[in-house]
């Protein structure tokens, strides 16, 4: 994921990352702290205050969901090349690309070289965004012609759908989305009557339907 710095930030601790307004940062981890993200800029890594940056949203980024949930999600989409990028369950800051091969889901670990560039095979990229764009027009598979292709969820509102949290909800699983009472959530999937999927505060995950009330903005 990429983000744009809204303001300049001077690091005051050794584990923080300084940046200037307008810099493009790579977000490595969004899950561990509600106020700070781990990011990279010009080969240096550190924590940055999330209110100083704006994350560039992408429908293909699913955060820290499990391999099993990724497979279930993609197999429900009867669409060759449907894909998502998820954070590694075992190695924070690392990513995997999960792709619908038609009869199964294949997973590719995104590798990184010392300079910080991402790659799957020979080609190197400065960001996950560049990697995704490349494999939209170049096959990601070696033995088959499979291109990354966006697809809308099976059930998608005709216009943006939002809900407001009526209660606090603490995620019990990495695939879930923690909420505070009053939070506004953009609902992106309502396939399950008990668990909806939505986006809030730059994070994407599942939350109980009974904890929210639809609203019109």
Swiss-Prot record:
Expressed in inner ear, in neruonal fibers innervating cochlear and utricular auditory hair cells (at protein level). The keyword Nucleotide-binding does not apply. PROSITE patterns: SH2, SH3. Residues 1-58, 158-217 form the SH3 domain. Residues 60-152 form the SH2 domain. It is found in: Membrane; Synapse. Keywords: Membrane, Repeat, SH2 domain, SH3 domain, Synapse. GO terms for biological process: sensory perception of sound. It is a peripheral membrane protein. Associates through its SH2 domain with ligand-activated receptors for stem cell factor (KIT) and erythropoietin (EPOR). Also forms a stable complex with the Bcr-Abl oncoprotein. GRAP is associated with the Ras guanine nucleotide exchange factor SOS1, primarily through its N-terminal SH3 domain. Interacts with phosphorylated LAT upon TCR activation. Interacts with SHB. Belongs to the GRB2/sem-5/DRK family. Couples signals from receptor and cytoplasmic tyrosine kinases to the Ras signaling pathway. Plays a role in the inner ear and in hearing. This is GRB2-related adapter protein. The gene is Grap.
């Amino acid at each position: 994921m990429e983000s744009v710095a809204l303001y300049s930030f001077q690091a005051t601790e050794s584990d923080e990352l300084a940046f200037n307004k307008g810099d493009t940062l790579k977000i490595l981890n969004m899950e561990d702290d509600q106020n700070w993200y781990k990011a990279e800029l010009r080969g240096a890594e550190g924590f940055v205050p999330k209110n100083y940056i704006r994350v560039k949203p992408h429908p293909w980024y699913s955060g820290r969901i499990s391999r099993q949930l990724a497979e279930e999600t993609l197999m429900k989409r009867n669409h060759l090349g449907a894909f998502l990028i998820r954070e590694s369950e075992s190695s924070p800051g690392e990513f995997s690309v999960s792709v619908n091969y038609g009869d199964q889901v294949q997973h590719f670990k995104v590798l990184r070289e010392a300079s910080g560039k991402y790659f799957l095979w020979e080609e190197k990229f400065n960001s996950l965004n560049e990697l995704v764009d490349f494999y939209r027009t170049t096959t990601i598979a070696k033995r088959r012609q499979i291109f990354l292709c966006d697809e809308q969820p099976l059930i998608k509102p005709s216009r943006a759908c939002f809900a407001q949290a009526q209660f606090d909800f603490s995620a019990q699983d990495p695939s879930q989305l923690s909420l505070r009472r009053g939070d506004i959530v953009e609902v992106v999937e309502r396939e399950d009557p008990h668990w909806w999927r939505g986006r809030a505060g730059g994070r994407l995950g599942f939350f109980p339907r009974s904890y929210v009330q639809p609203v019109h903005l």
